[in-house]
């Protein structure tokens, strides 16, 4: 079986004396929806950074869609992420001098593969549809600096989903959303994954969301992975 994500003998440390992650094996099948949890400082965001190619493992293999990211240069990892990964950052990473629709369209405009996956639908039209689904459709010409935190988070969500990436990585994506908007987001996220067959890696402290996922991955205080059975 070819896994969407496969890690083996992975170790990572920001400084040599302080190991952050030690992962002997982690395999995630195409289309899996994996819920990642663990105490603060256990390495959840670091794990996402390795899977997205933002960080490079010190040892071992990090294979995403058959590509070992540890063998790629920084520029090549950036290109791979742009083509295949939709990342909802915990800090949003919006471009402050762009408005809402421009932020949503940004990665799709600079990445040919994402545009191709939209087919005949224009990028702006697809971006507007996502904004409408997330309740920010009337804010598309507004500067992101004028948005509430919850609205900024929904812009980040729309940007990550545009272009139907094969891998969706979400770092605390519901943390700034109220109950209604959280439900809207989760519905859209799971519908998008089902429609495209995307693999979802979702980090959250809210374990009440865990039953929605078919995989759960616990990061322990020892910075290692503990896997629950596949549902």
Regions picked out by a protein language model, each given a short descriptive name:
Residues 52:
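Helix-to-loop junction immediately C-terminal to a conserved catalytic motif
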Residues 164:
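Conserved catalytic motifs of ABC-family nucleotide-binding domains
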Residues 68, 105, 112, 118-139:
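Conserved ABC ATPase "signature" region
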Residues 143-147, 151:
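Conserved ABC ATPase signature
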Residues 168-171:
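Catalytic Walker B motif of ABC-type/P-loop ATPase nucleotide-binding domains
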Residues 60-68:
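Conserved ABC transporter NBD signature motif
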Residues 98-107:
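Short coil-to-helix segment of the ABC ATPase nucleotide-binding domain corresponding to the Q-loop/switch region
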């Amino acid at each position: 079986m070819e896994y969407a994500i496969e890690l083996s003998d992975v170790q990572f440390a920001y400084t040599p004396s302080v190991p952050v992650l030690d992962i002997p094996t982690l395999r995630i099948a195409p289309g899996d929806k994996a819920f990642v949890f663990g105490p603060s400082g256990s390495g959840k965001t670091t794990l996402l950074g390795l899977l997205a190619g933002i960080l490079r493992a010190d040892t071992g293999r990090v294979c995403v869609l058959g590509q070992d990211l540890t063998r790629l240069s920084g520029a090549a990892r950036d290109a791979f992420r742009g083509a295949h990964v939709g990342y909802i950052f915990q800090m949003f990473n919006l471009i402050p001098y762009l408005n809402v629709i421009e932020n949503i369209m940004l990665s799709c405009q600079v990445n040919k593969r994402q545009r191709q996956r939209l087919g005949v639908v224009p990028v702006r039209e697809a971006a507007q549809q996502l904004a409408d689904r997330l309740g920010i459709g009337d804010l598309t010409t507004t500067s992101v600096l004028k948005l509430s935190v919850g609205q900024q988070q929904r812009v980040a969500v729309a940007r990550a989903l545009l272009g139907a990436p094969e891998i969706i990585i979400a770092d605390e994506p519901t943390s700034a959303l109220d109950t209604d908007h959280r439900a809207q987001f989760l519905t859209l996220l799971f519908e998008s994954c089902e429609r495209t067959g995307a693999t979802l890696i979702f980090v959250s402290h809210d374990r009440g969301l865990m039953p929605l996922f078919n995989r759960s991955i616990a990061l322990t205080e020892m910075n290692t992975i503990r896997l629950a059975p596949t549902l």
